[in-house]
Every structure is written in C-alpha cells, then in structure tokens.
Design a protein with these regions (language model features):
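Short loop/turn and low-complexity linker motifs enriched in small/turn-promoting residues
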Residues: 16-158
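Sec-dependent N-terminal signal peptides
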Residues: 3-14
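N-terminal hydrophobic targeting signals that begin at the initiator methionine
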Residues: 1-2, 18
C-alpha cells in the first residue's frame, strides 16, 4: 500500500506542472525563476508548479526587474515583460557650493558625477549654500549632461 501511495503522489506532482513561456523585450535578457537562472529570453517550455513564483530579469543597459507571478493550474502560461532602459546622465557644476538631490534619496556635492538612471521621470533639486536653487523633473530618455552655474551680474550692470 505504501508503494502505491508514493507512486500516486509522484504521478500527481509530475502532472501538476504548468508550461511557462517568458517573453522579454529586449530579447536576450537573463531570466531567473525563484533564484535559479533558467535561460535567456525568450524562454519556452519551462515546467513550473502552480503557486507563487518570482521572476527576475537582467540585461546590461536595462534596469533589473523583479516580478511576482501567480501560476494557476493550467497547461501553459505566457508571461510578457518589457524592461526599462538605463541612460547615462551627467551632472556638472562650474563652481563649488552646489548640493544635488535626486528623487529625495540620493545626495551629492561632487562637481562632476555620472549616474545610470532608469528611463522615466526623476525629481532633481539643486541647492546652493543650502538654499533651494532649482527644483525640476528630469526625464531620462537619452544620455545627457546638465551643467549648473549661478548667474552673477557684472559689476556696474543695470
């Protein structure tokens, strides 16, 4: 009787597999399922058990992405993802005294800095001697450089 139960459990666990296809733009992204690398996108015909799973996507030049998926008991699940590109954004100040703050999280005082930012809108605040100098939304949609300097009127000017 024990052998029959074990065999029945094995058959049920094998039968409860779902075929997973993972499509990613851009192609060639590394696909990691529950901490295990399962290939480069597109991944076709990978067997998974129903339940919750974590998919992580990685590719140079793109922001890594993690997604939680709930796999239902079905024959096939096709998961489509689009990764967000990264852009090189440079910030430069022509004089000392500037403090930069990005998204309320990252702060620096360097006169030159190069950041890789995920595509999209980012809030940039610039302070000069601890006074707000500039507050704007920077859209990362290409590689670009921002140069900051204070306006100083010439002596004797009106």
């Amino acid at each position: 009787m024990k052998q029959i139960l074990i065999l029945q459990f094995f058959v049920v666990s094998v039968m409860a597999q779902v075929t997973l296809d993972v499509k990613v733009l851009p192609k060639g992204a590394t696909v990691i399922l529950d901490g295990k690398e399962i290939g480069s996108a597109p991944v076709k015909g990978y067997s998974v058990k129903p339940g919750g799973h974590e998919i992580r996507l990685e590719k140079n030049g793109y922001a890594p992405a993690t997604h939680e998926i709930a796999v239902q008991d079905a024959k096939r699940l096709v998961a489509d993802f689009i990764m967000n590109p990264m852009y090189t954004i440079k910030f430069r100040s022509k004089e000392k005294g500037f403090t930069f703050e990005l998204n309320g999280e990252h702060t620096w005082r360097d006169e030159k800095i190069k950041l890789n930012l995920e595509a999209g809108a980012h809030r940039l605040r610039v302070y000069y001697l601890d006074e707000l100098f500039d507050d704007q939304v920077v859209v990362a949609d290409r590689n670009v450089e921002f140069i900051y300097t204070r306006y100083q009127p010439e002596p004797g000017g009106n």
